[in-house]
Regions:
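G-domain G4 guanine-recognition motif of GTPases
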Residues: 42-43, 67, 93, 145-146, ...
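Active-site phosphate/pyrophosphate- and oxyanion-stabilizing loops and adjacent acidic/basic residues
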Residues: 78, 157, 186
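Short beta-alpha junctions and helix-cap segments that line functional grooves
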Residues: 153-155
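C-terminal lobe/tail of nucleotide-utilizing enzymes
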Residues: 1-14, 177-192
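Active-site segment flanking the S-adenosylmethionine/decSAM binding pocket
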Residues: 124, 142-145
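Catalytic acidic motif of RecA-like/P-loop NTPases
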Residues: 41, 125, 148, 157, ...
Length: 192
């Protein structure tokens, strides 16, 4: 280094603003006494079906609302509205493969969470992008379906390490797939 040149380290996470927004949203929801759950998985793993069954078991005790995130359809929001008593809204991402804290905040505002005990965000079906963005949820849950294979925690470790819980779905077809329930879970800190 010379007197004419100086190096200034300005490294900052590209996620810093989103992380701050997510923490603010988390605190706001906590003050409202609304629990936000972020449900993530690959497309077709059974997120919506699992939500329908879960909501139908919980809705007599909890006020529940659901935000469905998809690139362009409203199929899942319609399914939730038709098969449960939960309020359902659709969030179109316009090609984005995830939701961030600001997008989630827009959904929370539209869902009007002040009267809800539980708000559920069904994130875009993808094992990569949704794991990279903090949505402001109090809990992240991932679904892994048997047909996807038991190697997904090794192939997509971030998804499985940021989640607070994992659901193994479609276990009724386990005999037809090469899926070892005891395989590789410890790699990502998952206790089966």
């Amino acid at each position: 280094m010379t007197d004419k040149m100086k190096i200034i380290e300005v490294k900052q996470s590209v996620f810093a603003d989103n992380d701050a927004d997510a923490e603010k949203l988390r605190k706001e929801l906590k003050s409202e006494k609304t629990f936000l759950l972020n449900l993530m998985s690959a497309p077709g793993s059974g997120k919506t079906t699992t939500l329908v069954q879960t909501i139908n078991r919980l809705e007599k005790d909890l006020k529940i609302g659901v935000m469905e995130a998809d690139i362009d359809s409203d199929v899942d929001a319609y399914t939730i509205a038709e098969k449960t008593n939960a309020k359902s809204i659709q969030l179109h991402t316009g090609g984005m493969c995830h939701l961030d804290a600001d997008m989630t905040r827009q959904g929370v505002k539209e869902l009007d969470t002040k009267d809800l005990d539980l708000a559920i965000l069904e994130n875009v079906g993808n094992l990569v992008c949704p794991a990279e963005f903090d949505t402001g949820a109090s809990m992240n849950v991932c679904i892994l379906s048997v047909p996807e294979g038991d190697d997904k925690p090794l192939k997509y470790p971030l998804m499985f390490t940021i989640c607070d819980a994992m659901i193994i779905n479609k276990i009724d077809v386990c005999d037809y797939f090469d899926f070892d329930m005891d395989n590789k879970w410890d790699v990502c800190g998952i206790i089966a």
